[in-house]
Amino acid sequence: RPTAPCWQATHALLAHLSAAGFDGAPRVLAAGQATETLTYVPGRAAVPPLPEDTLTDAALVSVAELLRRYHSAAASFDPARFQWPRPIPARFRTGLVSHNDVHPANIVFRDGRAIALIDFDLAGPGSAAWDVAAAARYWAPLQDDQDIADSRQGRALERFRIFLHASGLSQAGRRRAAEAVVANHDWTYAIVTEMAAAGHQGFADHWREVAGPAARARRWCQRHQRDLLAAAE
């Protein structure tokens, strides 16, 4: 596949994860200025329509546990000597290299459990709380009920609480994740709209599809900010 602009940083991170014994990410087999070859991770990426076995509370907890293992392995990686892609807001950066794109399509499942993260192109200095906020937005999901058409409908706050408490974050970390939800939403969709405006057709098509639900999700998160913080306790 084509290499991303900050591929050297990404490859160093993946090599570190492998050396640390983390088996939940691909390994680099070959790389050049234009293309890279990574190992194939057997399983099924959680692409829409999401399979029923990825919608269970057990699957939700497995995503949180996968992130927890990733953050533990990444904690000893020093990002200082590399250039990284788009930075996250400074108030949510701790120095840990977070994945920053914990979209369902970037998580590989096997037998109803999350077993690997893929697509580290947006990875960069961030925090565990930032990743947890991002993952929870997608996996709770933190959306208006009219945009949830599966068994998760009506359970966003309950599932958010489950995810936070399975993430391994301290109480302060969980509160930080709750505080990061709207900022993470804005950061994510700024990338989409900027890429669409720059003429990338795939992003333009995606934005036309999600603009309405994204706006409703942001309003939902703002309206429920106190509830999100309460779930962190």
Task: Place the predicted regions along the sequence by residue.
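Eukaryotic Ser/Thr/Pro-rich intrinsically disordered, low-complexity regulatory regions
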Residues: 177-179
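Short, polar/flexible loop-turn hinges at active-site or ligand-entry regions and domain interfaces
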Residues: 49-54, 124-126, 143-148
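A conserved alpha-helical element in kinase catalytic cores
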Residues: 1-73, 77
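Active-site acidic catalytic loop and adjacent metal/ATP-binding pocket
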Residues: 28, 88-134, 141
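Conserved kinase catalytic-core helix
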Residues: 49-84, 95-100, 105, 109-110, ...
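Active-site activation/catalytic loop segments of kinase-like enzymes and analogous catalytic loops
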Residues: 132-168, 184-195
